[in-house]
């Protein structure tokens, strides 16, 4: 399949952790971050260091919101995707595989973002 987004990241977001899988032409790397602000800033720094251009995450409850709010200040295309649009693959049962699957779908341009209002509307 054709690569659409060569430098991308899939995030599997949970209450206490975020698993991030970065895919670049050089390869793939997965890291785990906690959800405290300090840790999310480390995630943002890592994405910048890897020169990521696109980031996708599932719209899991409210846990995606602090990550989205922090990353929207960077020069990234952010996608928050309905979990129903990320079809389950048999045997895909771990958080690491979830992050890799999201990154792979994003890499090939197979994800569509949900509508997220801009910051001023979200703060109303």
Locations of regions flagged by a protein language model:
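Phosphate- and other anionic-substrate recognition elements at nucleic-acid/protein interfaces
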Residues: 1-124
